[in-house]
Amino acid sequence: MSTQNNQSIRSSCDRCRSHKLKCTVAPENSRSGSNRCTRCIRAQVTCVFGHRSQSKRSTNVKKADIKSGTNSQETTSMQASTIVPGRVSVSPDLWVGRQEVEEGLPIGSDGGPSMGDGDLWAELGTNHDLNVFDLTPSSLPTYNSQQQFSATDFCSAPMVPHSDLSAINSQEWQFDVSEHPDQTTTAPHVIVQLSALVTNIHETSKSLGESFWASLAESSQLKNYPIGRVLSLSQDFTAILECIWMSKTMDYKQSSSFVTSESDGQDGISSFELEDVLDYGELLSTVGTSPGRSDFSTSTHSSVATAVDMPTMLLVLSCYTSLTKLYSLVFEHFESHLSHLPHSYTSPTSHTSPRWGLGLQLGELPSADETCTKVYTAVQILLDAFQSVEDVVGLPRSLSAVRQQTCGKEEEAESGDVFNRASLWTDFLAKSVFKATVKGTSEEDCEEIRQLSIKVKSLKALIRERMKL
């Protein structure tokens, strides 16, 4: 009997295998070549040693190897399109579990040759970190066509704890806020800012008008007057207006590059018309001004004014009017307090006649009352802030409460002139808005601004009188 046949003959006879008994061949029978076990000899039955059946696992592997040659390209494309590129860690239990289901036998049983976990991964030639694109169809374990292991099952398989899959795209897909400035939080719209400013101005005016500041009995109480709130409102208003001018000027410069320039004969005439901003026929008829008239000296001014929408313009005028009322209230409180102070209290050394000579020093001069000095300083600070507001607003000189005091008669007569800076509106538009806020009938177009100007003049005169200037 050849070596190949001996390897295929079972070591136990059929009778012993059926009874699950140990089959032992007597030495003398082995030498004689009968190959009969001792149990069959005692039972006096024929002892038959059958051949081993071919291993089912080896048959499946051979069939899969033949089939994998034809489907290698398809399998590789499916894995490449499904699995994320990179180093993927795959547990060896993945192949072990599939092998147990296919064969129905435990790994390492006596039914045939088996391959352990270490042998499997040694054959693949990798460690636990397995590169998916290094796998070839011949190196991957394959099975029959009914239960072929697909790429979807591979992606859903459990990974080892030290998997690098989560680290592949952790930095690639991080959102950098600095690279997307448009996504950051922006400042509120200018209309929202102006609306909030109007509310703050009205609340401040109400709190000061209903407080005890209008009737002060002692000069020490004036030290707690909240001029910082009024000053802060003026500064906020100026900052908002500067932002409006900056944004609208930039928008005009960008749009002007796409617009053809007008003829040289029309450079001094603005193309701005009120109908572009206002569509109210009653306002035009009330004002009685031609729509084609413009108070802007250049076309740039008119273009920038056109870019500002009507709600913004009206809110700016509302803020300016409310701020004017607030200033009038504050100056009225100052004047009321100073008018009730005795003359002797302001300058106790005014009636004395000191000897002034060559040795007179600055510190020896009589000083004015401390209250008058502080009120004078407060008035100057508030007027400077209000003048900044008027400059940024760009109102005509005839509507300015502070500029009128520094202008000559010739400049005051030029009611249609505007400052060198561009204006948000035309002269007659501003006057019409202010005129609508006047209570009763008056010949003046802007009664509130006129009253503020008168209040400033009288307060300054009273301060000079009290300080003996």
From Swiss-Prot:
Gene3D superfamilies: Zn(2)-C6 fungal-type DNA-binding domain. InterPro entries: Carb_Metab_Trans_Reg, Zn2-C6_fun-type_DNA-bd_sf, Zn2Cys6_DnaBD. Residues 68-82 have a biased composition (Polar residues). Its main location: nucleus. Keywords: DNA-binding, Metal-binding, Nucleus, Transcription, Transcription regulation, Zinc. GO terms for cellular component: nucleus. One of its GO terms (molecular function) is zinc ion binding. It is found in: Nucleus. Residues 58-84 are annotated as: Disordered. Residues 13-47 bind DNA. Transcription factor that regulates the expression of the gene cluster that mediates the biosynthesis of Equisetin. This is Equisetin cluster transcription factor eqxR. The lineage of its organism: Eukaryota, Fungi, Dikarya, Ascomycota, Pezizomycotina.
